[in-house]
């Protein structure tokens, strides 16, 4: 069982199945839906670097806002803290991509903080004094959020505020930037490898 209480079925046989057979008769009008996520790493095909960094927001002693502390790979996340999720998209020189989408993978229980009103943050852009936090437009997805990128013609920084409500150890697929009308053209975080996040 997953921490959320739902069941997870893992294939135990040797090799991968090529078909699925059901025993018994199904009632008329029955429908079967099979969903799966491949654990096989995907390869990026677009010459764009996608870098993801998480920052924990720690309150400043004078109460004027927060200080952003960059986390390293493997650092534990706290369910009672607020985080900045930062992506930097960098295309190769002279390359321009239009109508793209950034899809950020999230673990169960994670959500984008919908309001950033009144939040002042120091340390994201080298600033020592807190400045108003501004986030990109986004839309919620299934265990993800998406940010439209109308045009990518140079380094672009995208940030959101995140909270984590569910504790556990989660394997996240790579986040990706892809072209809306050529979805096979994509760039991935961490060379497409799974990332493990621990939420306490």
Regions inferred by a protein language model and the residue ranges of each:
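Long, domain-scale non-catalytic interaction/scaffolding regions in large secretory-pathway
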Residues: 1-200
């Amino acid at each position: 069982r997953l921490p959320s209480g739902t069941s997870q079925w893992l294939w135990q046989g040797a090799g991968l199945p090529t078909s699925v057979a059901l025993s018994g008769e199904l009632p008329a009008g029955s429908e079967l839906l099979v969903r799966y996520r491949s654990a096989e790493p995907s390869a990026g095909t677009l010459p764009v670097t996608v870098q993801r960094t998480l920052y924990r927001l720690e309150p400043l002693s004078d109460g004027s806002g927060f200080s952003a502390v960059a986390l390293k790979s493997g650092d534990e996340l706290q369910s009672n803290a607020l985080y900045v999720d930062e992506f930097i998209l960098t295309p190769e020189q002279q390359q321009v991509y239009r109508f793209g989408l950034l899809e950020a993978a999230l673990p169960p229980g994670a959500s984008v903080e919908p309001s950033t009103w009144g939040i002042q943050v120091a340390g994201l852009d080298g600033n020592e004094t807190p400045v108003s936090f501004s986030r990109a437009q986004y839309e919620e997805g299934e265990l993800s959020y998406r940010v439209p990128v109308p045009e990518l013609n140079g380094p672009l920084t995208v940030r959101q505020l995140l909270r984590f409500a569910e504790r556990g150890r989660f394997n996240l697929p790579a986040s990706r930037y892809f072209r809306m009308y050529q979805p096979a053209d994509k760039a991935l975080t961490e060379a497409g490898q799974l990332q493990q996040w621990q939420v306490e």
